[in-house]
Amino acid sequence: MCDKIFHNLSGKTLVATPYVITKGIYHKSLIYMLSHTEEGAIGLIFNRLVNHVDLKSFFKIKEDKITSQVIVPIYLGGPIEHEKGFFLHSRDYNKNLLLDFHNDLAVSSNLEISEDIAFGQGPKNSLFIVGYTAWKPGQLEEELEKNLWLVMDCNKEFIFADNPENKWHNALKHLGIDEMYFSSQIGNA
């Protein structure tokens, strides 16, 4: 039996195929991969808009600093640790980064970025995401073998595009795939 070759998907986007038949969180989801190693993987779903929040009240920014509300959408990044918030943002903002990628994206998770966004000094593009998605060692590779995910290069214009409900269909279109081409049978040909 041959050893499987490991391909690092950090900085890539996972596109759920229709084979992710559950109507839950992963159905038609898009996941930006933060880290993918032989020890497992972590990602953020970026097309599950769940609500809007006032940054001032959510992050308890001092009232005297900001006079008006700054409402931002909240995305559900996955089923793990919903009390953790992340900003997936353009690389033009580089203060206290949690993760820095070579594809013009970064991740921050601190009060400073929320204050900078509230003052109009934050990144040009950002998504506020609560929670994350994680896989155990080998789990993501197994799901890829079962055709549950497609992999595409990251495109920040795509990630930050309006209308999150259309992003999954647009991802398939970007990959040249019509949803109708997927068989109702799960498996490999």
UniProtKB/Swiss-Prot annotation:
It comes from the Bacteria. InterPro entries: AlgH-like. Pfam families: DUF179. GO terms for cellular component: cytosol. PANTHER family: UNCHARACTERIZED PROTEIN YQGE, UPF0301 PROTEIN YQGE. Belongs to the UPF0301 (AlgH) family. This is UPF0301 protein RT0098. It comes from Rickettsia typhi (strain ATCC VR-144 / Wilmington).
